Amino acid sequence: MTSRMPLMAGNWKMNLNHLEAIAHVQKLAFALADKDYEACEVAVLPPYTDLRSVQTLVDGDKLKIKYGAQDVSAHDSGAYTGEISGSMLAKLKCTYVAVGHSERRQYHHETDEIVNAKVKASFRHGLIPILCVGEELEVREAGNHVTHTLTQVEGGLKDVPAEQAETIVIAYEPVWAIGTGKVCGADDAQEVCAAIRAKLAELYSQELADQVRIQYGGSVKSGNVAEIMAKPDIDGALVGGASLDADEFVKIARFRDQ
């Protein structure tokens, strides 16, 4: 039995304004019981404009839900219009920040070098990066999905020391399964997540590899989460659309009951 605490993180993407965010987090908090938090860490990744409202709610009501951002600047401050720095997120008491999400790589042309700089920026400010990796459909169909994903893992962790790497979360998200309704089979997801863990052992140590949490992301729902979570190298889920439905996200967090 793994000692890794499962992490269910809801990536809201560009959805929910700050008022909707408050109502949504309140609904999650009301539905989740102490036993749920003992079995699983629950986090939300709202848009930047919601973070202060979520922080105020979590602090004021002493909620056990964690929160974080969907991206971070590689820079700490300066003339970078539209960017948000790690120090700003740290001041909002964010725990997590997603880095290298496929939509950032695809629409904002983020390379492994940029993702690596953002991983380092996260660590500089005491944030835990959720490093997102995964392949497009043509890469999988060519049989290169493992190699492609491990290249992203290695690129994202370049020059990251072990004492930082041991706290990172890695999210395997096959791009072709995100928001499409297509689900990567649990065995296929396990294949890549096991390869990621083996790569961590190669880059650092087996001990470190056994510590790192590896999530699966890609059309996760309450109906498939139990099968995914039964796999030995999958330690949680990065949930997109389903996290916008509070009842559904609570069911996902209660994967052990599904």
Curated annotation (Swiss-Prot):
Reactions that this protein is recorded to catalyse: D-glyceraldehyde 3-phosphate = dihydroxyacetone phosphate
PANTHER family per the UniProt record, alphabetical: TRIOSEPHOSPHATE ISOMERASE
NCBIfam families: tim
EC number, UniProt record: 5.3.1.1
Task performed by this protein: Involved in the gluconeogenesis. Catalyzes stereospecifically the conversion of dihydroxyacetone phosphate (DHAP) to D-glyceraldehyde-3-phosphate (G3P).
Protein's recorded name: Triosephosphate isomerase
Keyword Transmembrane helix: no
Family to which the UniProt record says this protein belongs: Belongs to the triosephosphate isomerase family.
Protein's pathway: Carbohydrate biosynthesis; gluconeogenesis; Carbohydrate degradation; glycolysis; D-glyceraldehyde 3-phosphate from glycerone phosphate: step 1/1
CDD domains documented for this protein: TIM (cd00311)
Assembly notes: Homodimer.
Catalytic residues in the record: 101, 173
Gene: tpiA
Keywords in alphabetical order: Cytoplasm, Gluconeogenesis, Glycolysis, Isomerase
Sequence positions that bind substrate: 11-13, 179, 219, 240-241
GO MF annotation list: triose-phosphate isomerase activity
Primary residence: cytoplasm
Source organism of this protein record: Streptomyces avermitilis (strain ATCC 31267 / DSM 46492 / JCM 5070 / NBRC 14893 / NCIMB 12804 / NRRL 8165 / MA-4680)
Leading EC class: isomerase
Gene Ontology cellular component terms for the protein in this record: cytosol
BP terms from Gene Ontology: gluconeogenesis; glyceraldehyde-3-phosphate biosynthetic process; glycerol catabolic process; glycolytic process
The keyword Transcription regulation appears for this protein: no
Subcellular location: Cytoplasm
